[in-house]
Swiss-Prot record:
It catalyses: N(tele)-phospho-L-histidyl/L-threonyl-[pyruvate, phosphate dikinase] + ADP = N(tele)-phospho-L-histidyl/O-phospho-L-threonyl-[pyruvate, phosphate dikinase] + AMP + H(+); N(tele)-phospho-L-histidyl/O-phospho-L-threonyl-[pyruvate, phosphate dikinase] + phosphate + H(+) = N(tele)-phospho-L-histidyl/L-threonyl-[pyruvate, phosphate dikinase] + diphosphate. InterPro entries: Kinase-pyrophosphorylase (IPR005177), PPDK_reg (IPR026565). It holds the Pfam family Kinase-PPPase. The keyword Cytoplasm does not apply. NCBIfam families: PRK05339.1. Keywords: Kinase, Nucleotide-binding, Serine/threonine-protein kinase, Transferase. It comes from Enterococcus faecalis (strain ATCC 700802 / V583). Its EC number is 2.7.11.32, 2.7.4.27. Bifunctional serine/threonine kinase and phosphorylase involved in the regulation of the pyruvate, phosphate dikinase (PPDK) by catalyzing its phosphorylation/dephosphorylation. ADP binds at residues 151-158. This is Putative pyruvate, phosphate dikinase regulatory protein 1.
Length: 270
């Protein structure tokens, strides 16, 4: 029968750090059952902390904490020294090392890492947005966009959308095809958020031919015909003029360069 150890984890935030450490450590003791039913998050007062520590002492538990408040850290340390409670403070020793090295005190703000993580989650949300509203899918999403890219096929709309999404911009894009009516919702779109992309007919023809070849298809189609491409570009220019949309020529430009120019255009208009 496995030996059982009761573990209390205490944090003034979510407590994920202590949970991860416990999971890593327990993996090294396959013959011990760690009972971690007591996970106390958002502990912010000394009174609440001491009640938890008293219960842990009664249960003869091992206590792991990730507190950042000096007041709470001191209270827990004094309690464990006075009572013999088996207590591990994960944060204070690291804080002391940093303070000794840099001479800077911690800000003692619980949950700070999760605030920083918001930027990451905002980026993920922007990427999901770009995927959802790529290539004119569900035009209703245009109104929620930070940027709407418009252009004929193969003018880098999708890769530029994804690049900008990785920087936190909510980007949708719309392919312009002469035979396909524009979505009515375009009339409601803020012109300040729209950017047109164009490319030289010759370069566009080469890009489209390469695309068809990669799919194992022949390239003798209207899709790669320079005259047809010129017609598409002329139509796109009409749309850009109608809505007052600034235009960026992506010929021989990298995705990064195009994205930089787009942000520059937006800054000029705002």
């Amino acid at each position: 029968m496995k030996k059982e150890i009761i573990v209390y984890t205490i944090s003034d935030s979510l407590g994920e750090t202590s949970q991860k450490l416990l999971a890593a450590a327990s993996a090294q003791y396959p013959d011990i059952s760690f009972l971690n039913r007591y996970n106390f998050s958002f502990v912010t007062t000394e009174e609440e902390l001491l009640e938890i520590l008293k219960d842990a002492l009664k249960d003869k538990a091992l206590v792991v904490s990730t507190l950042v408040s000096k007041q709470l850290i001191t209270a827990a340390k004094e309690f464990s020294e006075r009572t013999g409670l088996l207590y591990l403070d994960l944060m204070a020793p690291f804080f002391e090392l940093i303070q000794a090295k840099a001479g800077v005190d911690p800000i003692e703000e619980p949950g700070r890492r999760h605030q920083l993580d918001r930027a990451y989650f905002d980026k993920i949300s922007a990427i999901e947005f770009a995927v959802k509203y790529d290539d004119g899918k569900n035009p209703q999403g245009f109104l929620d966009s930070d940027i709407l890219l418009l252009g004929v096929s193969r003018t880098s709309k999708t890769p530029v959308s994804m690049y900008l999404a990785n920087q936190g911009y909510r980007v949708s894009n719309l392919p312009l095809i002469p035979e396909v009516p524009l979505p009515p919702i375009l009339e409601e779109m803020d012109p300040q958020k729209m950017i047109g992309l164009v490319c030289s007919p010759e370069t566009l023809g080469q890009i489209r031919s390469s695309r068809l070849a990669s799919l194992g298809l022949g390239n003798e189609t209207s899709y790669t015909n320079v005259e047809r491409i010129e017609q598409e570009l002329a139509y796109a220019e009409e749309i850009f003029a109608k809505y007052g949309i600034p235009v960026i020529d992506v010929t021989a430009k990298s995705v990064e360069e195009t994205a930089f120019l787009i942000k520059e255009k937006l800054d000029e208009r705002n």
